[in-house]
From Swiss-Prot:
GO terms, molecular function: rRNA binding; structural constituent of ribosome
Job of this protein: One of the primary rRNA binding proteins, it binds directly to 16S rRNA central domain where it helps coordinate assembly of the platform of the 30S subunit.
Gene3D superfamilies per UniProt: 3.30.1370.30, 3.30.1490.10
Sequence similarity: Belongs to the universal ribosomal protein uS8 family.
The encoding gene: rpsH
Name used for this protein in its record: Small ribosomal subunit protein uS8
Lineage: Bacteria, Pseudomonadati, Pseudomonadota, Gammaproteobacteria, Pseudomonadales
Gene Ontology CC terms: ribonucleoprotein complex; ribosome
Oligomeric form and interacting partners: Part of the 30S ribosomal subunit. Contacts proteins S5 and S12.
Origin: domain of life: Bacteria
Pfam family, one: Ribosomal_S8
Biological process according to GO: translation
UniProt keyword list: Ribonucleoprotein, Ribosomal protein, RNA-binding, rRNA-binding
PROSITE patterns xrefs: RIBOSOMAL_S8
InterPro entries, sorted: Ribosomal_uS8, Ribosomal_uS8_CS, Ribosomal_uS8_sf
Amino acid sequence: MSMQDPLADMLTRIRNAQMAEKSVVSMPSSTLKVAVAKVLKDEGYIAGYQISSEIKPLLSIELKYFEGRPVIEEVKRVSRPGLRQYKSVEELPKVRGGLGVSIVSTNKGVMTDRAARAAGVGGEVLCTVF
């Protein structure tokens, strides 16, 4: 069976692993998933990530906890295959008044909403993380 929305699957795996208090979660790798994992690491939401170099590459994400609670409180998919959400630089959403981040796919790569505003570019709002 083919996966319809690999990014939603990635976010669900992260959410489920954190609820189960796992330290590492693995999933099939893709360029978009690696780019999102890099943004999550740069923003401090995950401890790290690795890509295994097997026949079918796997992306392993090290989850991060603070005082026994997951660092990621909420992660939501915004743009989905059935309803893409494209926003201009002025329309990019702030998550919880700027405390969280929106991850945006732009023509300059995958970045946070703050980086997209600084670069003056809009794009597809992939997900929000708080």
